[in-house]
UniProtKB/Swiss-Prot annotation:
This is Retrovirus-related Pol polyprotein. The gene is Pol. Residues 90-101 have a biased composition (Low complexity). Its EC number is 2.7.7.49. It catalyses: DNA(n) + a 2'-deoxyribonucleoside 5'-triphosphate = DNA(n+1) + diphosphate. Residues 90-109 are annotated as: Disordered. One of its GO terms (molecular function) is endonuclease activity.
Length: 120
């Protein structure tokens, strides 16, 4: 069998498999993807992946600075964190001290912003 015969056979198999696959994925496309519930300013706990003996599994709470549909940027951690690795922290009672405030400064470049930390 030549290369052309193999490619034609592969194309025939692809045609047979394509329609059932397209129908299966069409059902999933009808359901909207729901992003995580976290918003800027929320407080979250971050999962600690490697815990030592008697060490808590969650660290924080941290304040959410930026969000994407799948990840969060939190105060105090340089890397972005996937939304599956955080959970919401309970809100502190009224009248308790809060964390620092943050100010967003835009630049000429639409892909750059500057975050500055203010006094609590």
């Amino acid at each position: 069998p030549s290369l052309q015969a193999h490619l034609q056979a592969l194309q025939a198999v692809q045609r047979e498999v394509w329609k059932p696959l397209a129908a299966a994925y069409q059902d999933q496309q009808d359901q909207p993807v729901i992003p995580h519930p976290f918003r800027v300013g929320d407080t979250v706990w971050v999962r600690r992946h490697q815990t030592k003996n008697l060490e808590p599994r969650w660290k924080g709470p941290y304040t959410v600075l930026l969000t994407t549909p799948t990840a969060l940027k939190v105060d105090g951690i340089a890397a972005w964190i996937h939304a599956a690795h955080v959970k919401a922290a309970t809100t502190p009672p009224a009248g308790t001290a809060s964390g620092p405030t943050w100010k967003v400064q835009r630049s000429q470049n639409p892909l750059k912003i500057r975050l500055t930390r203010g006094a609590p």
